[in-house]
Amino acid sequence: MSDEEHHFESKADAGASKTYPQQAGTIRKSGHIVIKNRPCKVVEVSTSKTGKHGHAKCHFVAIDIFTGKKLEDIVPSSHNCDVPHVNRTDYQLIDISEDGFVSLLTENGNTKDDLRLPTDDTLLAQVKDGFAEGKDLVLSVMSAMGEEQICGIKDIGPK
């Protein structure tokens, strides 16, 4: 038996859950919720009173954090909803490849090469222009439910 047969690559999340349960009645505006299997930021919450047949209901209006699409859901306030683990991480921009991927420097000195340029036109222009001008840029990357996307940019001065 060689050592190679027992070697495996560890994954970043190590099997951790992508969501956690939270009672619908406790989710507030600007919190996060999973609607139709998409991570969303809540923009509006309204609750209806208990009626003759059952529970008070929460009506959520939310925006998908990656696509910007508006989604809605109605859930009994006593039921649990899935809430995504949403993380924001800052990485320094090293390079932009010709096929639309960015090369980022992680905190531990490794490079991260699996992220595409942002789809938002304003952000895309800021990244490309800043990089072309030779500025030192830090990109904010939002990750939730196995997806990642560049969502912000900071200029930390000239190189």
Swiss-Prot record:
Task: Provide one Gene Ontology biological process annotation.
Answer: translational elongation
* Modified sites of kind Hypusine: K52
Q: Which domain of life is it from?
A: Eukaryota
Q: Where is this region: Disordered?
A: 1-23
- Database matches in InterPro entries: IF5A-like (IPR001884), IF5A-like_N (IPR048670), NA-bd_OB-fold (IPR012340), Rib_uL2_dom2 (IPR014722), Trans_elong_IF5A_hypusine_site (IPR019769), Transl_elong_IF5A_C (IPR020189), Translation_prot_SH3-like_sf (IPR008991)
What keywords sit in the KW lines?
A: Hypusine, Initiation factor, Protein biosynthesis
Instruction: Sum up the protein's function in the record's words.
Output: Translation factor that promotes translation elongation and termination, particularly upon ribosome stalling at specific amino acid sequence contexts. Binds between the exit (E) and peptidyl (P) site of the ribosome and promotes rescue of stalled ribosome: specifically required for efficient translation of polyproline-containing peptides as well as other motifs that stall the ribosome. Acts as a ribosome quality control (RQC) cofactor by joining the RQC complex to facilitate peptidyl transfer during CAT tailing step.
Family, similarity comment: Belongs to the eIF-5A family.
Q: Which PANTHER family match?
A: TRANSLATION INITIATION FACTOR 5A FAMILY MEMBER
Q: What is this protein called?
A: Eukaryotic translation initiation factor 5A-5
